[in-house]
Amino acid sequence: MSREQIIKDGGNILVTAGAGSGKTTILVSKIEADLKENKTHYSIAAVTFTNKAAKEIEGRLGYSSRGNFIGTNDGFVESEIIRPFIKDAFGNDYPDNFTAEYFDNQFASYDKGLQVLKYQNILGTYSNPKKNFKFQLALDILKKSLVARQYIFSKYFKIFIDEYQDSDKDMHNLFMYLKDQLKIKLFIVGDPKQSIYIWRGAEPENFNGLIENSTDFNKYHLTSNFRCCQDIQNYSNLFNEETRSLIKEKNEVQNVISIADDMPISDILLKLTEEKQVLNIEAELVILVRRRNQAIEIMKELNEEGFNFIFIPQTPLDRATPNATLLKEVIKYVKNDRYSIYDLAAEIVGNLSSREIKEIQKIINELLVPNINQVLINQVLINLFAKLEITLDTREITAFTEVMMTNEFDIAFDTNEYLHKIFTVHSAKGLEFNQVIITASDYNVHYNRDTNEHYVATTRAKDKLIVIMDNKKYSDYIETLMKELKIKNIIKSI
C-alpha cells in the first residue's frame, strides 16, 4: 500500500528503503507520476552520488528525462547555482569559467577557498574530507543572490535525492534550505543501515534526524525485499532492532547455513558443494571479506586446491567520489580491447552525439601510448572533464593515476564474467549474487559494531547465504537474540 500512497502523495516525502526493496523503481515511478501531473513550466531535478546511478535513473525515465536535471549532487550545484550566479553573489572578480581540477589546491578555511577561486580560477576543496566547500559555496550564493533564488524557485517544483544516508552535513544544509526557504518539495530516499561511508564525510545522522524529528515530511518505509529469499531476509533483519519485526519465521531454514571453522577453507567449500550439496559450484559463488590481504590469502589457498576464484579488488577509484564510475569506464576502455568507446559513452549521463563521442575518443586515446606519465594523465583528465563539464577532484586524479600506472587492479576492469569471485564488503555494495559466503569473525555485531557492514554483506545474497562460524561470541549473540525474540529457526547448522 505504501507504494501507491507515495505515488499519490503531493508533499515532501521521506522514504526509508531497505536492501532489495526497489528504491530506484519507486523513485523513477514517482518522477514519472509527478511529471505526468505537472501542467506548468516547472521541472524536476533527480540527484544522486554517482554518474552510474544517475545514468540508471535517466535510462529508466527515457524520454521523460528531457528538460529535467538528472545527474550528480555535485553536478547540480555547480551547473545550476555556482557557475550561473557566482558573479551576482560575489562580484565580477569571481570567475564563472573556473576549472575543475583541484590538484594541490586544498585548504582549511572557507575564506581561503574563495581566494583560490578568485585568484587562481580554480574551484578547490577542503583538506578535511568531511567538509564540503562546493555545497557551502552554493548555499552562500543562494543566500546572497536574489536572482539565484528566483531562478531555482521558478525552475524546479521538486528535487529527488537518492542515497540520502550518504549525504554530508553541507549537502544536508543546502537541501534543507531549498525546502525551508525556497519552498521546493523534496523526495528523499535512503537506508541508514547501508551507510558505510562515514569515513569520507557521510553523516547518516542527518537522515536519522529527519526520520525521528522532522514534521515536514510524509514518511514511508519500504520493507519488502525483492532480492533476497525469506531465509536471508530473516537473518539480515535479526541484527537490526528496527527490522526485527519484519522477521517471518519459517518451520525450516534451508538457505542460511552455518558451518564450523574446524578445517581449511578449501575443505569447507568441498563439504558445502560435494558432501552436503548446499552450494552449487557450477553457479555464481562469491566470498565477502573485510580486508584485501584476507581476500588474497583465501584466493591463493582455494586455487592451490584446484578451485578457480578471482579476487575483484576495491580500487583506489572506489574510494573517490563522485566520478569514480566514469573514471573506471575510461580505464576499461584503455585497458580492455573488448570495451569500445560506445560502451563508455553509454555510461555517460546525457545523450551524446556522434561528433561528441568522437571528440571524447580523441581525448582518451592519448592514454593508449606505451609509456604514459603523470603529466599526460593530468592533461587528458582535465580535457575530458572540461568537455563533459564535470568537476574533477584531486583525489580522483590521484586514484586514477595509481590505477593506470600499475597492473595490480587490472582484473577489476576485465569484462569477462567469472563465476567464483572474492570481494571486500565495501566494493560489493550495490551488487547482488546468487550464493554468498561470509565469515562471522569479520563482524563485531555482538558489540553493536559493524552492523551496517553486516547488513550490506548478508543482503548481497539472493538465494543462499553461508556463515563460517569462527567466532563464538557471534554465535552466542545469535542464540541470545533468538531467545529474546522467541525464534526457533533462523540459521541451519551443518
From Swiss-Prot:
SUPFAM superfamilies associated with the record: P-loop containing nucleoside triphosphate hydrolases
Keyword match ATP-binding: yes
Pfam families documented for this protein: AAA_19, UvrD_C_2
Binding-site residues, ATP: A17, G18, A19, G20, S21, G22, K23, T24
GO molecular function ontology, one term from the record: hydrolase activity
Knockout or disruption consequences: When this gene is missing the Gabija type I system does not confer resistance to SpBeta in B.subtilis. When this gene is missing the Gabija type I system does not confer resistance to T7 in E.coli.
InterPro entries, sorted: DNA_helicase_UvrD/REP, P-loop_NTPase, UvrD-like_ATP-bd, UvrD-like_helicase_C
Domain notes: Contains a UvrD-like helicase domain.
Role this protein plays: Component of antiviral defense system Gabija type I, composed of GajA and GajB. Expression of Gabija type I in B.subtilis (strain BEST7003) confers resistance to phages phi105, phi29, rho14, SpBeta and SBSphiC. Expression of Gabija type I in E.coli B (strain ATCC 11303) confers resistance to phage T7. May be a helicase or contribute to GajA activation.
Subunit structure: Homodimer. Interacts with GajA; 2 GajB dimers dock at opposite sides of the GajA complex to form a 4:4 GajA-GajB assembly (GajAB). GajAB interacts with Bacillus phage Phi3T Gad1 protein; this interaction forms a 4:4:8 GajAB-Gad1 complex and leads to GajAB inhibition.
Name of the protein described by the UniProt record: Gabija protein GajB
